Design a protein with these regions (language model features):
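Generic recognition of stable, solvent-exposed alpha-helical segments in well-folded globular domains
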Residues: 46, 50, 175, 179-182, ...
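Anionic ligand-binding catalytic core segments
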Residues: 117-118, 126-175, 223-284
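A long amphipathic alpha-helix within ATP-dependent nucleotide-binding catalytic cores
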Residues: 171-203
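Intrinsically disordered, low-complexity acidic/polar segments
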Residues: 33, 112-113, 214, 228-230
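Active-site loop/lid in soluble adenylation, ligation, and acyl-transfer enzymes
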Residues: 1-148, 261-290
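Conserved metal-phosphate-binding beta-hairpin within the catalytic cores
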Residues: 103, 202-223
Length: 290
């Protein structure tokens, strides 16, 4: 069996070059505040991969995606080890567009902080009188630039995203900025409506898009996972304050409350975190994680 080494390691994912495709492995690492924690969260990588597959399958009518297979039998022999089973995805190679596509359907997090200051989020003026966690009249698109590991992503306005993309794709900045905005809002709307029918509010989420060899826009990376999205239980939803969520919030809250944490979580917080991930997966897909 030929040993393979990742060509790129992100905070959570490892990417392997498989010639005309990539193998994307979601590890059990967890990152908060752009820092990789010392803990691993068992099964987290499998939740991320299988949930992305679920949404990719559901949304091909809106936008094609980069997924080829999540079956390790379709991958080189190196990936036919237990540690890769379930958390690995074979993908098409894309030229990734250097903008994170954030769609917000509810006002929370950094969006709420910005609104409190001046009534806007990423240059978009919102109605007066919104409360924390309120549903927005329409989902808004608030792009950000993609940071290297250790840096923070920077929120930008739509106009700034046009200028930013024009540098990479001369003559196509406006076109690509508009397309990724319109596609990702459409993806969010379809998936948020479905999720609500299963008892989950998708408050906001981050998509990443790329160009295939023919210059078509394709959805890449992960899609609508607890790592890239805020999932709230619809049961008990009440604007006016923060909401409980099916994601890393347990971990974030504990780290904030314990500033001397040296980036290590107690096991109880790790267990609560994976419970939330599994609960979201089961509610959305109607299946238990294999």
């Amino acid at each position: 069996m030929q040993e393979m080494k990742p060509v790129k390691e992100g905070k959570v994912r490892e990417i392997y070059d498989n010639g005309d495709s990539l193998i994307m492995v979601a590890t059990d690492r967890i990152s908060c505040f752009d820092v990789i924690l010392n803990n691993e969260v068992t099964k987290k990588g499998t939740v991320l991969t299988q949930m992305s597959k679920f949404w990719f399958d559901m949304t091909q009518d809106i936008l094609p995606n980069h997924m080829i297979s999540v079956d390790v039998k379709d991958m080189p022999e190196f990936f036919q080890q237990d540690k890769f089973d379930g958390n690995s995805m074979m993908c098409r190679k894309l030229d990734m567009i250097p903008v994170e596509c954030i769609v917000r359907g509810y006002i929370t997090g950094s969006g709420w902080a910005s609104y409190q200051k001046n009534g806007t989020v990423c240059g978009i003026t919102l109605p007066e009188g919104l409360k924390e966690s309120d549903k927005l009249p329409e989902p808004i698109y608030t792009p950000s630039t993609k940071a290297e590991i250790g840096d923070h992503d920077e929120n930008i306005s739509f106009e700034q995203s046009v200028t930013h993309l024009e540098k990479y794709y001369p003559g196509h900045g406006q076109e690509y900025a508009e397309k990724i905005r319109d596609y990702t809002i459409a993806l969010y709307k379809k998936c948020a409506e479905y999720a609500l029918s299963k008892g989950i509010i998708i408050a906001d989420t981050k998509f990443e898009c790329g160009l295939d060899e023919n210059g078509n826009i394709v959805i890449g990376d992960e899609m609508l996972t607890p790592d890239s999205s805020r999932f709230w239980p619809a049961d008990g939803y009440e604007p006016g304050h923060g909401q409980p969520s099916f994601d890393k919030q347990f971990a974030r809250d504990w780290l904030k409350a314990n500033p001397d944490n040296d980036w290590t979580l107690p096991q109880e917080i790790v267990d609560k975190t994976i419970d939330k991930y599994l609960q979201a997966y089961e509610m959305l897909t109607g299946e238990k994680l294999k």
